[in-house]
Amino acid sequence: MRLTRSLPAMVTALLAAFLATGVSAQTVLRFGHANSPGEVAHDLYKEFADNVTKKSGGQLTVRVFPSEQLGKEVDLLQQLKSGALDISSPSMPTLNSMVPAFEMPSAPFLWKDWKEAEAVIRGPAMEPIWTELKDKHNIVPLTKIWYWGWRNFTFGTKEVRKPEDMAGLKVRVPESPIWVEMVRGFGAAPTPIPFGEVYTALQQKTVDGQENPIPTIFSRKFYEVQGVLSMSRHMLQNNTILINKSSMEKLKPELQKLLIDEAAAASAKNSEMQQAREVSMLEDIRKSGKTRIIDNPDRDAFAAKMVPVYVRLESRWGTENWKRVRAEIDRMRSAK
């Protein structure tokens, strides 16, 4: 009888002893993204996850789910907000569905070079925008920087050296206001097509052209069905690694720091690798002989066409946000 009465107490004591072993201290974070195994991004995300597990002594495990296993990029972002997902790596334009001002770093012809862009994205001019993401959507950055590259135009046969050369051409764009307004500003017809259908659309001449970073143009073999590559460098593509704020706050400070440090290390390695790939893959495209490369299109003429585009999008981004970013760019340039 006494044994029966003491059984709950024994179970409680055993459970407490089990928890005291530290098993309960193990935390698993789920990291969903859109890239495929074998791509640089996925390989670095996996390396990031492995380093976190190793350096935390097994206290923290990051499980990586590639290839849109958990949903498309926009879906992953919503899961990140709700806490159904812990970590993801959206592009800045994807974030515009939550905070439209995140489109600004992708504004055409905004940046002189990557160094300038990186400093502003990390700096105080963008801080209120990151704060809005945190306060309204429960999301914070592990790294604000994940260099993807400068986007360039490709076309079937048309040699595009100046905006007037694009008049009337159908150009594939992501379904995002900044891309639509940009292509329209050049006098072409923006045509939203899902990324997975771009190669077929080019091959079947559903559209005349598209734009992407060099590593994408090469790895997706767009250059095989496009006869012209115009090195417009019109837009910077930067991604991020973000974490659900509640997931982050549940971790001990030393584990929070570990995540941030390892994300920064992966980001730095990615920047170095991707910039090297831009150079080597452009050379591979050149050597293929399948694509004529226009190395020096009239970038000033293209940039001039973007002034009214900025005016149209300023209210979407927030006038104060846009003024603050432009002022920081001007300050940096005048200091040189």
Place the predicted regions along the sequence by residue:
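Bacterial N-terminal signal peptides that target proteins for export
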Residues: 1-11
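N-terminal signal peptide c-region/cleavage motif recognized by signal peptidases
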Residues: 20-22
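N-terminal secretory/targeting leader peptides
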Residues: 26-117, 125-336
